[in-house]
């Protein structure tokens, strides 16, 4: 009997993982560029973390190229993706260049980034084409309440995150009133957010106020500039304000209606070890969830269909929070006028709780010890069967 229960749990878990983890991945020519298609209103690009070194593409020599690899930025982005999925149930759009920077620099214009090599030019076009596709899809699915992050790593001696909004270090040192003028708003990669955020925060407040992205990161123990505590970087720190990608794939470019920034990660305590990457990825996830909630009034939790926090999510079944802490109340949003029978199964396939549920009901998780469980929801009237994986911490 126990063996049958184990088999049942394994089959259900396999189904649940396959169903929930399904993600389309598209590779460009020769697998140089990778696009992991997402459903979150978040697009992340990683241009400088690759290590492919094909002999068919000569090293770039045009216009004083930079060859430095942003070490472990791909690994960091993948860990961010995993943490976002754990917390929200959905993935961001993720675009990765696997070519070494000596072969391709997507953060330069085509001439300087590919130096006339046809293979590199194809990869450059695919990289930017995938970003365009990701942001267009995100905008269409989420009513332009979207965000873009171009992920890099810096080697500056000050171990802090540098957020580039296309404003120079000297410009960030200006007064709030000056930064709030139309002149500096037009320079900014978040100018659309300034014009349309639910709390009517000013440009300066969104750059370095208590609810800026830098401050959210700092509150999660990752000092960032600009932020409330570090409002500007100073003019001697070699601060990175943002490059070609940010200028062309955010609302600084009229043809790219998405807010965003370039994020330069320090090496120590973030990129240098798997454990540090995991800690940072969780902090980033918590920060971006807070950012969307604060400025877009959008909840990323239970995200298969996103909506504003104040609206009922237009999704057939939602279970939250997930992951949860033992003792939390498990909330269910179910279709109205339909009664479901539920069973909660542990890893042995044993039913640890069961009962009936209707729209907007909840159950106590006190019976659930830390671990992985499956919630099986069934409605005999219409042969509806739903299986959801939950994690109790």
Question: Where in this protein do the model-derived segments appear?
Answer:
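Short, conserved catalytic or adaptor-binding loops enriched in Gly and charged residues
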Residues: 253-254, 309-312
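C-terminal outer-membrane/trafficking sorting elements
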Residues: 311-393
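N-terminal catalytic or cofactor-binding beta/alpha core of small enzyme domains
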Residues: 23-303
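Bacterial Sec-dependent N-terminal signal peptides
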Residues: 1-24, 308-309
């Amino acid at each position: 009997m126990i063996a049958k229960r184990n088999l049942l749990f394994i089959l259900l878990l396999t189904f649940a993982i396959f169903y929930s983890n399904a993600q389309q991945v598209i590779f460009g020519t020769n697998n140089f560029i990778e696009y992991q298609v997402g459903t979150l209103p978040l697009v992340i690009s990683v241009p400088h973390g690759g290590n492919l070194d094909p002999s068919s593409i000569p090293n770039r020599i045009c216009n004083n190229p930079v060859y430095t690899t942003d070490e472990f930025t791909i690994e960091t982005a993948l860990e961010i993706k995993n943490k976002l999925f754990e917390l929200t149930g959905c993935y961001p759009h993720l675009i990765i260049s696997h070519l070494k920077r000596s072969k391709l620099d997507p953060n330069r214009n085509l001439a300087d980034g590919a130096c006339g090599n046809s293979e590199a030019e194809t990869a450059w076009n695919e990289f930017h084409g995938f970003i365009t596709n990701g942001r267009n899809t995100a905008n269409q699915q989420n009513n332009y309440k979207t965000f873009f992050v171009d992920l890099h790593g810096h080697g500056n001696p000050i171990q802090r995150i540098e957020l580039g909004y296309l404003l120079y270090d000297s410009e960030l040192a200006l007064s709030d009133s000056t930064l709030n003028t139309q002149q500096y708003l037009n320079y900014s990669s978040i100018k659309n957010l300034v014009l349309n955020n639910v709390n009517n925060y000013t440009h300066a407040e969104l750059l370095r106020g208590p609810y800026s992205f830098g401050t959210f990161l700092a509150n999660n123990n990752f000092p960032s500039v600009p932020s409330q505590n570090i409002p500007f970087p100073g003019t001697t720190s070699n601060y990175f304000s943002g490059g070609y990608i940010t200028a062309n794939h955010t609302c600084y470019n009229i043809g790219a209606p998405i807010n965003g920034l370039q994020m330069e990660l320090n090496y120590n305590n973030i990129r240098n070890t798997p454990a540090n990457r995991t800690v940072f990825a969780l902090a980033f996830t918590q920060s971006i969830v807070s950012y969307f909630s604060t400025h877009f009034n959008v909840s990323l939790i239970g995200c298969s269909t996103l909506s504003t926090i104040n609206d009922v999510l237009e999704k057939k079944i939602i279970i939250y929070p997930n992951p949860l802490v033992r003792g939390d109340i498990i909330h269910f949003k179910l279709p109205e006028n339909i009664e479901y029978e539920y069973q909660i199964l542990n890893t042995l396939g044993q039913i640890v709780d069961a009962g009936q549920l209707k729209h907007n009901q909840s159950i106590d998780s006190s019976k659930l010890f830390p671990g992985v469980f499956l919630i099986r929801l069934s409605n005999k009237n219409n042969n509806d069967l739903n299986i959801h994986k939950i994690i109790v911490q």
